[in-house]
């Protein structure tokens, strides 16, 4: 089972789901709430798959969206998951946002395709634009850029090819 990093734990930002994860010894760090009051958590890459399965078992049966971004030039890449508890006749389903930070030198995160099938195209887009490798994804390949494209266009350190170089390539 995972361990809780108690030194980085801020009780002021800890929500109900963070308390549940702590009770069940899942490693995470609360990051507060967004403008709608949705709890935001940080989970380490190596802990993400087991935490994702636990969240699914807890009732977060819908991956509303997955996206990724480059936090800072030369810094971490972040994969963001917005999860929702979909229940019958639920006017305001519970939501959570989970962020997984990875190094740009080894950007590997376990795929949650086997937990939420809707992750298929979303993880592929994050791979295509930022180069995050989703381990265990059955179809991980470029989805927007040509297979021959070099580099990851949404990284802040990406150097845009000269237009004429691209034109001459065809």
Curated annotation (Swiss-Prot):
Give the record's GO CC terms: chloroplast thylakoid membrane
One GO BP on record is:
photosynthesis, light reaction
Name the Gene Ontology molecular function terms of this record: NADH dehydrogenase (ubiquinone) activity; quinone binding
Compartments in which it is found: Plastid, Chloroplast thylakoid membrane
Q: What is its EC number?
A: 7.1.1.-
This protein's UniProt keywords: Chloroplast, Membrane, NAD, NADP, Plastid, Plastoquinone, Quinone, Thylakoid, Translocase, Transport
What is the topology of this protein in the membrane according to its UniProt annotation? Peripheral membrane protein
Checking Gene3D superfamilies in the record gives: NADH:ubiquinone oxidoreductase, 30kDa subunit
| Disulfide pattern | none
Name the chemical reaction catalysed here.
Answer: a plastoquinone + NADH + (n+1) H(+)(in) = a plastoquinol + NAD(+) + n H(+)(out); a plastoquinone + NADPH + (n+1) H(+)(in) = a plastoquinol + NADP(+) + n H(+)(out)
Q: Which InterPro entries match?
A: NADH_DH_suC, NADH_quin_OxRdtase_su_C/D-like, NADH_UbQ_OxRdtase_30kDa_su, NADH_UbQ_OxRdtase_CS
Pfam families, A to Z: Complex1_30kDa
Would the keyword Disulfide bond be found if you checked this record's keyword annotation?
no
SUPFAM superfamilies xrefs: Nqo5-like
Instruction: Keyword check for DNA damage, yes or no.
Output: no
What's the family? Belongs to the complex I 30 kDa subunit family.
PANTHER family referenced in this protein's UniProt entry, alphabetically: NADH DEHYDROGENASE [UBIQUINONE] IRON-SULFUR PROTEIN 3, MITOCHONDRIAL, NADH DEHYDROGENASE UBIQUINONE IRON-SULFUR PROTEIN 3
Q: What quaternary structure, including any partners, is listed in this protein's UniProt entry?
A: NDH is composed of at least 16 different subunits, 5 of which are encoded in the nucleus.
Describe the function of this protein: NDH shuttles electrons from NAD(P)H:plastoquinone, via FMN and iron-sulfur (Fe-S) centers, to quinones in the photosynthetic chain and possibly in a chloroplast respiratory chain. The immediate electron acceptor for the enzyme in this species is believed to be plastoquinone. Couples the redox reaction to proton translocation, and thus conserves the redox energy in a proton gradient.
Q: What is this protein called?
A: NAD(P)H-quinone oxidoreductase subunit J, chloroplastic
């Amino acid at each position: 089972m995972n361990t809780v990093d108690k030194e980085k734990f801020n009780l002021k930002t800890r929500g109900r789901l963070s308390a549940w994860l702590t009770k069940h010894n899942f490693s995470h760090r609360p990051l507060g709430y967004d403008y709608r009051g949705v709890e935001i958590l940080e989970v380490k890459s190596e802990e993400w798959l087991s935490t994702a399965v636990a969240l699914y078992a807890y009732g977060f049966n819908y991956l509303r969206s997955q996206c990724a971004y480059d936090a800072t030039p030369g810094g971490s890449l972040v994969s963001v998951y917005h999860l929702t508890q979909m229940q019958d006749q639920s006017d305001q389903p519970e939501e959570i946002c989970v962020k997984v930070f990875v190094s740009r030198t080894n950007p590997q995160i376990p795929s949650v395709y086997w937990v939420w099938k809707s992750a298929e195209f979303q993880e592929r887009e994050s791979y295509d634009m930022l180069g995050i490798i989703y381990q265990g994804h059955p179809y991980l390949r470029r989805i927007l850029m040509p297979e021959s494209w070099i580099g990851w266009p949404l990284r802040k350190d990406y150097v845009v090819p000269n237009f004429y170089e691209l034109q001459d390539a065809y």
